[in-house]
Amino acid sequence: MDTCGVGYVALGEAGPVGNMTVVDSPGQEVLNQLDVKTSSEMTSAEASIEMSLPTPLPGFEDSPDQRRLPPEQESLSRLEQQDLSSEMSKVSKPRASKPGRKRGGRTRKGPKRPQQPNPPSAPLVPGLLDQSNPLSTPMPKKRGRKSKAELLLLKLSKDLDRPESQSPKRPPEDFETPSGERPRRRAAQVALLYLQELAEELSTALPAPVSCPEGPKVSSPTKPKKIRQPAACPGGEEVDGAPRDEDFFLQVEAEDVEESEGPSESSSEPEPAVPRSTPRGSTSGKQKPHCRGMAPNGLPNHIMAPVWKCLHLTKDFREQKHSYWEFAEWIPLAWKWHLLSELEAAPYLPQEEKSPLFSVQREGLPEDGTLYRINRFSSITAHPERWDVSFFTGGPLWALDWCPVPEGAGASQYVALFSSPDMNETHPLSQLHSGPGLLQLWGLGTLQQESCPGNRAHFVYGIACDNGCIWDLKFCPSGAWELPGTPRKAPLLPRLGLLALACSDGKVLLFSLPHPEALLAQQPPDAVKPAIYKVQCVATLQVGSMQATDPSECGQCLSLAWMPTRPHQHLAAGYYNGMVVFWNLPTNSPLQRIRLSDGSLKLYPFQCFLAHDQAVRTLQWCKANSHFLASAGSDRKIKFWDLRRPYEPINSIKRFLSTELAWLLPYNGVTVAQDNCYASYGLCGIHYIDAGYLGFKAYFTAPRKGTVWSLSGSDWLGTIAAGDISGELIAAILPDMALNPINVKRPVERRFPIYKADLIPYQDSPEGPDHSSASSGVPNPPKARTYTETVNHHYLLFQDTDLGSFHDLLRREPMLRMQEGEGHSQLCLDRLQLEAIHKVRFSPNLDSYGWLVSGGQSGLVRIHFVRGLASPLGHRMQLESRAHFNAMFQPSSPTRRPGFSPTSHRLLPTP
């Protein structure tokens, strides 16, 4: 930097150092300025001033070229220089400020500071300022009006600095000072440039807006576009001609239709127009469409919109991720199914031969007061108007699942379940338990949306097991079902599905279930009914390895989860000690697969890790991506795992004791059912918890007073159903969880009751039950701790909701009863909860996607159809799927030929 620049900075832009300003006395400032700015042709007065200046230090002398002024400054008039010299004599001594003079406000009061002697002057060159002593300057900045000499010096400095004021890096138009306004600050101009550059980048990244096909060509891109005018010119005057006005009006019309899809492409606008409704991180400025009005079922359209969306998403997902045939080696063999005699089957049958008394009240229908008592493995006919079905399993229900059926098959629906043999039996979880049990398969017939089921629910066959209690059971999601009439060479049987059982002895059993028609055709005509079989499983899954196998180390197996996407080769299980274990079912590794002498397989896990400090109560696989898994344990934690990095969970949440999870297909989170023992007051119930990717807070789906034992979600409907200890089964339609649920209004409109079970006392004579307490809805039964005491003095009252329509839902009696129970219900926990609901499952099949099965402590299983959520869109999908299924699967010949391939007749080339 030359001395000219240093002299100008010292005078015009003195920088603050500490609390003082670094300037010399006015006379010294003028001398330094003149020393730097004078030319080679000086007057005598200027020469005398030059001689009074101190000698510069070595190395800082000015060369003649540096001391020469620019040509435009050499034309300075002599008159100004003489006036400058005359004024120098007047300001050679500092002028003291007047004591009563005010400067912008009140005068400061206090002791005066002693004046320090002026230090010897030194040339203002870089590096000579005393940085260690910032208070070494002798004189503060002079107050008061500036003298004529100072004004002349300021004018001279501005003229000298004008050629260097413009920076080549900034456009000249950015720093123009508007007339009558203050100059724009540097920060504001930089921010404006940044916004303009950001608008240009967004405009290039966004697709071009769709223009009107019949409109003229867009104007030249060199002309800046006008985004939107506040008002048209009065009288419609034309300024730039008709063609330009025509382009302008077409542009405004397109923007009105598309709601400002992106920012303006022009960078010459002072402020880029960005819509305020555009969310952060989104690439489109389109607003969320508003669904106003009411749907035909009586619910608002904004509540039904996620349901219609889930239908499309689930249909597309199953077409891409499901298969028609998997595990071809596990075909049922007739010789492995041994039919038990009545004496042999007796230890495996439930002890209760008759159900407790129960009555059903249906909303909108007259009460008949009929009490029902049905036999074991029997059912009652479906109601002709409400289509609900009930049957008795013989014991408390602890495990339940639907058999998956391909879309469009139109076949009968089946459910597999396990009931405890004894109504009063308890199962300790801390130790392994084995004993007789019965796995039941029930046929429900063809469940449709157009008509009432014509057939009763019937017991198909049972499988006798010696592995104790079955805590969980899961069917293979797809690829395990084939047509009932599939011709098989004996002893092969057409397969209904692959079923995995989580047993209390620590083992996981895998069964290949045949179609009932083919299996029952193998038994003799005088066979005992019901049919109970002793079956050899196709595979036994154990923890450990071939060298070290100790099932007691992990404890009981409490939960199962089958990989939801094809080829469904992985099966996960949760154990009592907090371990999560994974098996590769089609593995050929000799370290993981052993063939036993009876022909069955024994499989060992390929991966396991400690997920929780206590028992793993439930597992849920992410349907959209099989790399992710959610688990909930007795340590009150919910964890999300990436199976590629199982050493640490993605997210861990400790809130309450969770009983079951439901992970719906379209959403990035799980719906959680909880035990009320650790729940805060008013927060017990059902919550939706985000996995952590979107960062949403927990959404309170529905409040519950008692423990929610079971939870199930329907991917087709975007709806969850929950059954609790108080005997109430409710359903809740989830909002679109891809958006933040914090803005969801009136969640009470999204949930509705399906039925409510109450334990009602009655008189000694069954013909005269006390219906007064049932009608009041406030039962007050005596405390009975055993099943026998309870059924001798009570009966169950099921109060069903009309699910065909939801018109005026908030004012209907079942809805008011549900809301009253959410706030003022009283639980009696020191008696047998005979009305409690233990398991709830939505049908995963498209042909029966609106049907729901539930059961609990009483052993009664009930089936309901949520007819109000069925839509014409779902019916159209069913018809399309049936046509597609019939085109893919040709009807097979009834005759069996030797050597016929078991699978070649089933699959056709994919179109």
Swiss-Prot record:
UniProt feature, compositional bias: Polar residues: 35-46
In-chain residues carrying the UniProt-annotated modification Phosphothreonine: 895
Keywords tagged on the record: Nucleus, Phosphoprotein, Repeat, Transcription, WD repeat
Main location: nucleus
Example of a GO biological process term: transcription by RNA polymerase III
WD repeat placement: 465-521, 552-593, 611-651, 832-874
N-terminal signal peptide: none
Modified residues (Phosphoserine): 63, 132, 165, 167, 220, 260, 597, 871, 892-893, 901
Biased composition (Pro residues): 114-123
Composition bias, Basic and acidic residues: 64-81
Compartments, as annotated in UniProt: Nucleus
Residue stretches of biased makeup (Acidic residues): 253-262
UniProt feature, compositional bias: Basic residues: 92-112
Disordered, as annotated region: 34-187, 205-297, 765-785, 889-911
Gene Ontology, cellular component aspect: nucleus; transcription factor TFIIIC complex
Ranges annotated as biased composition (Low complexity): 263-275
Top-level taxon of the source organism: Eukaryota
Primary role: Required for RNA polymerase III-mediated transcription. Component of TFIIIC that initiates transcription complex assembly on tRNA and is required for transcription of 5S rRNA and other stable nuclear and cytoplasmic RNAs. May play a direct role in stabilizing interactions of TFIIIC2 with TFIIIC1.
Quaternary organization: Part of the TFIIIC subcomplex TFIIIC2, consisting of six subunits, GTF3C1, GTF3C2, GTF3C3, GTF3C4, GTF3C5 and GTF3C6.
Name the UniProt record assigns to this protein: General transcription factor 3C polypeptide 2
Organism: Pongo abelii
Gene giving rise to this polypeptide: GTF3C2
